[in-house]
């Protein structure tokens, strides 16, 4: 898919030679990068808040997720338009063309992830209205795992490094394991609680979709960094994911075992708290 898209991209670029000044392209690229970082930050925060809305039974977090919808929609439109304009230019570097295409793919995935976060928050609000319920204990764990992958994707976009994206791709399919365990629980729920349990079903589906969007983002980062022949981690339908809850993983030389989930999340939190992380060149 990416090879075909990249070939089409190059055809557009060559056929539009001289359409815009090359000096404009770097300004467009810088603007596109800033907008993409803004959308990454806002979308990740929405996903984080939606998961906390369920975990903490917090109506405030539910409202905070909805409040960012307008901003995300504006950023999605702006990124799409800027990337389109870039693809009509004669870009001097092939890497610039890859970035423009990857920005569109990342932007679309972030937009979809945000939409799922809004749905998760809405279903969490419904659970609060019903006074809560004895829910599936694995849902909080699933939320932490998905949130972790989302954060790794955002770090990959900010740092423009491939290692975090490859870590996410190494987890591809983990959401199916959570879904399988959830459906076993859901099928045995007392019929009197089924209506309320349906909200947790919707939350589980939303988290699964966000996980799939993280794979799209990670694939796009790999394509951006390495090109159309990068051979990013393929998904084989018949392959069983290696992880049940949280995989052992190595990020920048630090190995995290399944028992080290909280330490791993704390490390990512520290990265987000570092003032230099949010600086843009």
List each model region and its residues.
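Short hydrophobic alpha-helical segments enriched in small aliphatic residues
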Residues: 4-7, 14
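Cytosolic, long alpha-helical scaffolding segments
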Residues: 12-281
């Amino acid at each position: 898919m990416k090879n075909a898209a990249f070939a089409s991209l190059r055809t557009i670029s060559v056929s539009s030679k001289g359409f815009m000044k090359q000096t404009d392209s770097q300004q467009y690229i810088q603007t596109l990068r800033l907008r993409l970082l803004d959308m990454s930050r806002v979308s990740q925060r929405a996903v984080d808040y939606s998961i906390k809305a369920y975990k903490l039974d917090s109506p405030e977090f539910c409202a905070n997720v909805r409040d960012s919808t307008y901003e995300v929609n504006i950023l999605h439109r702006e990124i799409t338009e800027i990337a389109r304009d870039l693809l009509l230019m004669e870009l001097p570097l092939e890497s610039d063309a890859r970035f423009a295409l990857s920005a569109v793919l990342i932007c679309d995935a972030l937009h979809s992830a945000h939409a799922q976060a809004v749905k998760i928050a809405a279903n969490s609000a419904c659970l609060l209205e019903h006074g809560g319920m004895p829910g599936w204990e694995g849902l909080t764990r699933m939320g932490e795992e998905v949130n972790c992958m989302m954060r790794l994707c955002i770090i990959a976009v900010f740092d423009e490094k491939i290692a975090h994206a490859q870590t996410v791709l190494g987890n591809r399919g983990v959401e199916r394991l959570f879904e399988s365990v959830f459906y076993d629980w859901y099928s045995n729920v007392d019929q009197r609680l089924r209506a309320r349990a349906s909200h947790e079903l919707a939350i589980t589906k939303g988290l699964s979709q966000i996980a799939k969007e993280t794979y799209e983002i990670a694939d796009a980062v790999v394509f951006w960094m390495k090109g159309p022949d990068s051979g990013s981690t393929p998904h084989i339908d018949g392959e069983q994911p290696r992880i049940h809850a949280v995989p052992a993983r190595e990020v920048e030389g630090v190995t995290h075992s399944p028992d080290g989930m909280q330490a791993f999340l704390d490390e990512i939190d520290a990265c987000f708290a570092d003032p230099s992380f949010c600086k843009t060149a």
